């Protein structure tokens, strides 16, 4: 939060590029691009983003990454907020006030055609990498962890 270069994302390479678990906040877009470049990757190589939940530090750059071509995967309860983040942003603005932009940057809506709503136990395979969405409510009422068998 507000630390230059700090991103709450995990990168996993696959046969056609890479996927991310978490997008990180919108304020870290430049740092994310730089870290990808260090690994010989471009934004266009990010095929998918799997969100654990929709809090701004975990999902804030999801809409931006969707506009670069990534498919965004999320819990059913989080999907409406990614399509229309106004309620989420209004709530966060009451907490963070003038620090919203500095901490979180821009939070763009995810286009519906780029959004994948996952169910508990659902297995998704991307570029030969399979993962299973496992509902773990607690930190948020719309929380997943992802189980990777081959990573």
Regions found by a protein language model. Give the residues of each.
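Active-site neighborhood of phospho(di)ester-bond hydrolases with catalytic His/Asp-centered motifs
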Residues: 21-24, 47-53, 74-75, 135-138, ...
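Active-site metal-binding motif and surrounding structural segment of the metallo-beta-lactamase
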Residues: 30-77
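Conserved beta-strand hairpin/beta-sheet module of binuclear metal-dependent hydrolase folds
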Residues: 1-39, 43, 146-151
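Metallo-beta-lactamase
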Residues: 81-134
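Short alpha-helical
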Residues: 27, 57, 80, 87
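Residues at alpha-helix caps and immediate loop-helix transition turns in enzyme cores, especially N-
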Residues: 8, 31, 61, 84-85
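Core dinuclear metal-dependent hydrolase active-site scaffold
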Residues: 11-13, 120-150
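Short, glycine/acidic-enriched loop or turn micro-motifs at the edges of active sites
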Residues: 16, 25, 56, 138, ...
């Amino acid at each position: 939060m507000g630390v230059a270069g700090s991103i709450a994302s995990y990168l996993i390479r696959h046969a056609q590029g890479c996927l991310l678990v978490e997008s990180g906040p919108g304020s870290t877009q430049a740092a994310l691009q730089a870290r990808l470049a260090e690994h010989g990757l471009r934004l266009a190589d990010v095929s998918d983003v799997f969100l654990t939940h929709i809090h701004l530090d975990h999902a804030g750059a999801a809409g931006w990454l969707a506009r670069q071509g990534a498919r965004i995967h999320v819990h059913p309860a989080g999907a409406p907020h990614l399509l229309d983040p106004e309620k989420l942003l209004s709530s966060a603005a009451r907490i963070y006030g003038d620090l919203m932009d500095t901490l979180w940057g821009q939070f763009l809506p995810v286009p519906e055609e780029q959004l994948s709503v996952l169910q508990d136990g659902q297995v998704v395979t991307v570029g030969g990498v399979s993962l299973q969405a496992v509902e773990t409510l607690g930190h948020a009422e719309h929380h997943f962890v992802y189980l990777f068998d081959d990573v």
